[in-house]
Amino acid sequence: MTALPATSIAAPSLDDLDALNAHLETLRADERVAWALQHGPQQAALSSSFGAQSAVTLHLLTQQRPDIPVILIDTGYLFPETYRFADALTERLSLNLQVYRPLVSRAWMEARHGRLWEQGMVGIDQYNNLRKVEPMRRALDELNVGTWFTGLRRSQSGGRAQTPIVQKRGDRYKISPIADWTDRDVWQYLQAHALPYHPLWEQGYVSIGDFHTTRRWEPGMREEDTRFFGLKRECGIHEDI
């Protein structure tokens, strides 16, 4: 692997980021991870929804940094299968799991606002901010994360089609080492390392979030149609942070 000097990422200009992304596009995912762990600002952390294909990035990162903090946002509305999946992968991969939760319980939120996810786009956005965006922002701040790894892939939705491998968000670098992977790439990696899909994958769930805003994929649907009643794909974490 050809590594760029550390100063290339310490204070990059937009031109530097363009050149850096062009360079990283030529590397394998594991080489991108190695580069970012070496040259990115500390602390590094990985966020994971423990969704359909999350085992890939969890394995990819922990092969190189076993104790990397893994941030899970527990909205209080995850599928029971997701909690069990998180437990299983945490045990298998010896994850340094850091669970963050909203400041307000689900019961108190519903007492104040009702079922926000049933109140159109305005309600969904408010719900996502309360239960996902705020806890993630707090996690990144409290853990002093300088290099944030994600499992975003361009093929997941139209809104993610231009996802760069590295981008700067505020004072933080966001790294998506499998941004260019296809579903087949994911399948091959899982097979090669005997890693599981989420338990709901076999039931037709291709994108898995909260139980009340996730539905099975059906013929003719896009992956993004399975979330938030087809109104939107993103929960806000990768838009607002």
UniProtKB/Swiss-Prot annotation:
Q: What is the protein's major site of localization?
A: cytoplasm
Tell me one GO molecular function of this protein: phosphoadenylyl-sulfate reductase (thioredoxin) activity
Gene Ontology cellular-component terms for this entry are:
cytoplasm
Q: Which Gene3D superfamilies match?
A: HUPs
Which GO biological-process labels does this protein carry?
A: hydrogen sulfide biosynthetic process; sulfate assimilation, phosphoadenylyl sulfate reduction by phosphoadenylyl-sulfate reductase (thioredoxin)
From the UniProt record, list the coiled-coil ranges. Answer: none
Q: In which pathway does it act?
A: Sulfur metabolism; hydrogen sulfide biosynthesis; sulfite from sulfate: step 3/3
Q: Which InterPro entries match?
A: PAPS/APS_Rdtase, PAPS_reduct_dom, PAPS_reductase_CysH, Rossmann-like_a/b/a_fold
Top-rank taxon: Bacteria
Q: Disulphide bridges in this chain?
A: none
Residues of the active site = C235
- UniProt subcellular location: Cytoplasm
State the reactions this protein catalyses.
[thioredoxin]-disulfide + sulfite + adenosine 3',5'-bisphosphate + 2 H(+) = [thioredoxin]-dithiol + 3'-phosphoadenylyl sulfate
Extract the SUPFAM superfamilies matched here.
Answer: Adenine nucleotide alpha hydrolases-like
UniProt-listed Enzyme Commission number(s) = 1.8.4.8
Read off the HAMAP family from this record: CysH
Q: Which family does it belong to?
A: Belongs to the PAPS reductase family. CysH subfamily.
Functionally, this protein is described as follows: Catalyzes the formation of sulfite from phosphoadenosine 5'-phosphosulfate (PAPS) using thioredoxin as an electron donor.
Name of this protein: Phosphoadenosine 5'-phosphosulfate reductase
Q: Which organism is it from?
A: Xanthomonas campestris pv. campestris (strain ATCC 33913 / DSM 3586 / NCPPB 528 / LMG 568 / P 25)
Lineage summary: Bacteria, Pseudomonadati, Pseudomonadota, Gammaproteobacteria, Lysobacterales
Q: Which gene encodes it?
A: cysH
